[in-house]
Each structure stands twice: as C-alpha cells, then as structure tokens.
Regions:
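HDAC/HDAC-like amidohydrolase catalytic core signature
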Residues: 1-190, 195-232
Length: 232
C-alpha cells in the first residue's frame, strides 16, 4: 500500500493537558506516529514524504482568521510577561453572543475549545505538515491509485473550521475530502474512533456532497460530550 508521512510532524510535542481538573502529561506524543511509521515499514509498505501542496487546500476548509491565529499565537503568547511555555486557554466564551478579542489570552479562549491542545513554537508547522500529508494521499487517489494511507499527527477530526480541540488543529480528513471533491462529486468520510468526529461533522453538516459517518462511544459520558448523538 502506498503511504505518506512527513517527519516534520514529530516536532509537535505538547506537554500539558487537563483531565478532570488534574494537570497531566499530554498523551498526543510523537511516539504514536513512530509506532505506526515503523509498522508500515516493517510490513513492506511504500512510505513517501508528500510533496508540498501549499496552503490553498487548508484554506478551502478553515477560516482565514483561525489560520492566522494558529500561525502567530505562540509568538504573541511569549510576549506576555510570565506566560506559560505553551499556549493554554484559561477562558472559554459562549460564542453565540460574543466578539473575537484582540488580546492573545482572549483569542486563545476563542479559538481553542479545551486544554488538550496546547500550542508550542512547532505546532503550526507540524499541523500544516499533517494536513499536507492528508492532501498527498488524496492526490494519489486523484492520480489513479486505488488507495493511499496518510499517517497524520497532530490528528484532526475534533478541529472545526475555526476552532482547535481534542489534540486537533487542522482537520486532516476534511481537508483531504475537500481536495477529492476536485474530481469526485460525492465523498464519504468514515470516522472510526472512540471519540465522535465533531469537527468533521460540523464542517460538512450543511452540505450534501460530503457524507460524514462516525462510529464512537456514547457522548452522554464521553468526550466530546456535546456532539455525536443519534438525532444528529
């Protein structure tokens, strides 16, 4: 099987997360990708570094203001006296009746849904490499391959068009699906994960050209809690 992976993804190494009010080491570590990469090589799959596809496929899914935030927030955060080493929000507004603030602290709350996705100086480049890997696999299918595998981290299915969350910054599967729409009238995303793919669902919820199907644990008592119910 043809597979794609960009070593740039290893550079994102989040340290902090908060579970049930308790600070814990972040579990979305580069070792997860190393295990999968090594398994691909050990089983004889062809592993390629994707060629650059630029920012256009990402911009086709994510809002410009959100991308500007992801690209610049770490630098702005470090200018705050006494700020933490990683960008971690301490306020989460109700977006239905609010305005995008100018301050770095306020924007962290606006664009980050939880504390599981801290941003470091390498996060933007790694997230972009992850998304580019997904586009590379999608392009391989457009070029005639029957299948292609994209090894992507940071992951993506909790990322909304303008909101990070659940370890996710750029929605890799949504970006790949949108890229496939260049040649295909209909695309299906099958999301098999213990967590509901709330970001992916949100991006395509009002569209009939991309079907999202998520198999996940009951959100009544499991992340992401607010999405993933049967009536949706």
């Amino acid at each position: 099987m043809l597979a794609f992976f960009d070593p740039e993804q290893f550079k994102h190494e989040p340290k902090f997360s908060l579970f049930s009010g308790v600070p814990k080491p972040n579990s979305e570590v580069s070792e997860r990708a190393k295990v999968l990469r090594d398994a691909l090589l050990q089983h004889g799959h062809e592993l390629k570094i994707p060629k650059p596809h630029g920012i256009i496929p990402v911009e086709a899914v994510h809002h410009q203001d959100y991308l500007h935030f992801l690209k610049n927030i770490y630098r702005r955060w470090q200018e705050i006296p006494g700020a933490s080493a990683e960008v971690i929000p301490n306020i989460h507004p109700n977006r239905t009746a609010g305005n995008i603030p100018e301050s770095a602290v306020g924007q962290a709350g606006w664009y980050m849904a939880d504390t599981a996705c801290p941003i470091s100086n390498e996060t933007w480049n790694s997230a972009l490499a992850s998304a580019n890997t997904a586009v590379g696999a999608a392009q391989a299918v457009l070029d005639g391959h029957n299948s292609a595998y994209a090894l992507c981290r940071p992951p993506g299915h909790h990322a909304f068009a303008d909101l990070a969350g659940g370890f996710c910054f750029l929605n890799n599967s949504a970006i790949a699906a949108q890229h496939l729409r260049l040649n295909f009238q209909k695309v299906v995303i099958l999301d098999v994960d213990v967590h509901h793919g709330n970001g992916t669902q949100s991006i395509f919820y009002q569209r009939d050209d991309v079907l999202t199907v998520s198999l996940h644990a009951d959100p009544v008592s499991f992340y992401p809690f607010f999405w993933g119910y049967s009536h949706e």
